Amino acid sequence: SYSMCVPEYDYQKSKNPRRALTKNSKPCHNGGYDNEVYDYILYVNDILGTEENKKYLVLDILGQGTFGQVVKCQNLKTQEIVAVKVIKARQECLQQSIAEGNVLEYIDKKVDPKYKKYFIDLKDKFMHKYHLCLVFKLLSSNLYEIIKQNHHHGLCIKLVRNFAAQILEALCALKEIKIIHCDLKPENILLAKLNKPDLKVIDFGSACEEHQLLYSYVQSRFYRSPEVILGVDYSTSVDMWSFGCIVAELFLGLPLLPGTSEYEQLARMVQTFGMPPSWMMVEKKASNYVVKQDNPSYDYFNDKSGGRYSYRLKTLDEFNREFNLHESPAKQYFCDTKLDKIVMIYRLPKKNMPRDAVDREMHERSCLVHFLKGVLNISPLERWTPQEALQHPFITEEPWTGHWAPPTARFSSDIRRGGRSLSLV
């Protein structure tokens, strides 16, 4: 050892240089504890927390985002390995994370016990040098990582069905207590353990109560609903749109609607599902993307003639000229734009499958297409609820005859249509 060569050398473990885990570890704010973007500068073997039963030894970094960082830690009292979310010392991040903690506690208190297994547990929360720390059970890979590990090839229908049913159960629970997640995506759905397909929904930082909408700009773009893009007041149905996009991505291995901007996201929706109904076009935000025109077939005395006005999506050239932009046509991931074709002609799970196996696969795909059309209805008034979707043959595995409609009455849920409150019944 070094002390044998230099006997007078006094080695002290405490003087070892610490390995920084935070990407930008240059001290800038908060007495040198924070970097320039107000992230707490984390090092291996740091101790988070000061109270005796709330001390956590930092082991490794798990992730970093706009809210802050997630680190793998060990509870020094119980020896349990946990995930600690260390929030940035910025007011907007702090407020959003306090709200997340409140939502998780509300879910734990209000949700039916049979649904609790689908949500991440908030084990502890505390302040550390002006940073809010949220402590969670350490989970495994998220669904995006599962897709990536599969080389962006789709998962088998059996596993897609298993995952879809669990997410729907979680959405049933949220709908019953009138909570909207507002950021459902593959990254926010995690396996509890790597060797079991049990899922948990995480990241309630954007969540809100139905009828108390906190933000107009919600949902990650690929999973953003048409009503959010068009500025219509939204409900729990936005989570069902995100759910449909996730299920399609699990099967296809790639995002169904990978828009590069809000305009392009809406354009992809229109290509795949058609134009949204006219009542969704009345908000000011919609005028950024659509052109209003007189409806030549309008008849005041004939309800079936349509409204006084009709709408069409602006062309890319029109949109670029109006806003002085230079957006170019986006890359197409699939060889068709219609949902039926995208799903039905997607690669088979195995080469040289027997004819009867191919027939069974195509029959199941037909059922999947029908299911996706119900949860991805472009009108939130007609989109299926999680309770309805759970009864679809794709989930129940009942014989698929080619036709199905939700057998139950709609749960009441207010939504605004051009300033008037409607009830989904």
Give the residues covered by each predicted segment:
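C-terminal lobe substrate-recognition/regulatory segment of protein kinase catalytic domains
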Residues: 278-371
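A conserved loop-to-beta-strand element in the N-lobe of protein kinase catalytic cores
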Residues: 128-137, 144-145
